[in-house]
Amino acid sequence: MEKSEIKGFIAKRCAKELKDGDVVNLGIGLPTLIPHYLPEGVEVIIHAELGIVSAGKAPKEGDENYDPYHVVDAGGSPASVAYGGGFIDSASNFGLIRGGHVDACFLGALEVDAEGNLANWIIPGKKMPGMGGAMDLCVGAKHCIVCMEHTAKG
């Protein structure tokens, strides 16, 4: 398999874990590809840490909804809001997570040990220091799935 195909392969496999109607939180990076691979007939509600309930697929440059300056995901990449979606404040947002209302979360990681412990909190000098809502999601979501390449080189 070509390196360029690996992330899509992982996202497609992750999408198979979802059921129609699931409330899903997607971490930054690879997890944002998952909506592009949802099985036919499976519609999910995408919850975003920045307060979007019912986020749309990540738009690409040239798409009608592409606007890199107004709606972004937790990683700062362009995002969209699905028809009927909306925005909530941070307290309500984390109330959804901590209250057990998220069916599944998909997180990226730096590494995972043999017991499944997740390390994703910092790479010195990189853009995204800190774990964001990962702690809350690991505890509050009904299922937590780490999606990442096996090695830094794929």
Which residue stretches match the model-derived regions?
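Conserved phosphate- and dinucleotide-binding cores of soluble alpha/beta proteins
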Residues: 2-9, 60-154
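N-terminal active-site beta-alpha-beta segment that forms phosphate/nucleotide-binding
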Residues: 1-82
